[in-house]
């Protein structure tokens, strides 16, 4: 058993141990919860609180400025896409048409009055009443026409095929054998077919075009430009 002196000496040692523990505890508290720590914590809390209003302000600006422009930008993008799509389609169609050209045949039909026959851009009327050249021209004028004129071989062949009688007055005439042949509107004859004879008025015969004196009575052919042309493809 320990002696009484040893027991009496123990309290001072225990007292020193407790004192050291309290000092260490106090030191830890001062290092963790001292004024500097408290100040740092308060600074961090203030920084966080000061940042919150700034972020809220950015959110308000985002919702107030950017979002209202978004539908307009979306519509603009859609419009651009539509325009580009239409342009691409139009270009494709144009290229396809260019690659495969269409060949169309246009037939022209003269629109002529009743009992008139259309050839090219003219209408012809075959008058079976025999008259001299001057009176035959008068009959044609009454129908807003002239004694027949032809400018192409097609028209000439048509007249020769359908003239009927041995000879029909046409619109060729001249002042004398020394002058050139002209039509009733005084335009020059293109000499599509030679004219036989030395007289001053022309008529269409089985052999072509011949000249005769104007007082001879013959059938006649009138011609005029068609009023309009209808086209069929």
Swiss-Prot record:
Membrane topology, as annotated: Single-pass type II membrane protein
Chain intervals with Polar residues compositional bias: 16-29
Every C-type lectin domain range: 119-230
Region (Disordered): 1-45
Location (main, coarse): membrane
Record GO terms (molecular function): carbohydrate binding; natural killer cell lectin-like receptor binding
Glycosylation sites: 132
All ranges on the Cytoplasmic side of the membrane: 1-73
Subcellular location: Cell membrane
Transmembrane segments: 74-94
Alphabetic keyword roster: Cell membrane, Glycoprotein, Lectin, Membrane, Receptor, Signal-anchor, Transmembrane, Transmembrane helix
One Pfam family of this chain: Lectin_C
Keyword Mitochondrion among UniProt keywords: no
Function: Lectin-type cell surface receptor.
SUPFAM superfamilies according to UniProt: C-type lectin-like (SSF56436)
Keyword Transcription regulation: no
Stretches of the chain found on the membrane's Extracellular side: 95-233
InterPro entries per the UniProt record, alphabetical: C-type_lectin-like (IPR001304), C-type_lectin-like/link_sf (IPR016186), C-type_lectin/matrix_domain (IPR050828), CTDL_fold (IPR016187), NKR-like_CTLD (IPR033992)
Protein name per its UniProtKB record: C-type lectin domain family 2 member D6
Species whose genome carries this gene: Rattus norvegicus (Rat)
Any one GO cellular component localisation term in the record: external side of plasma membrane
Record field: compositional bias (Low complexity): 30-43
Superkingdom in the source lineage: Eukaryota
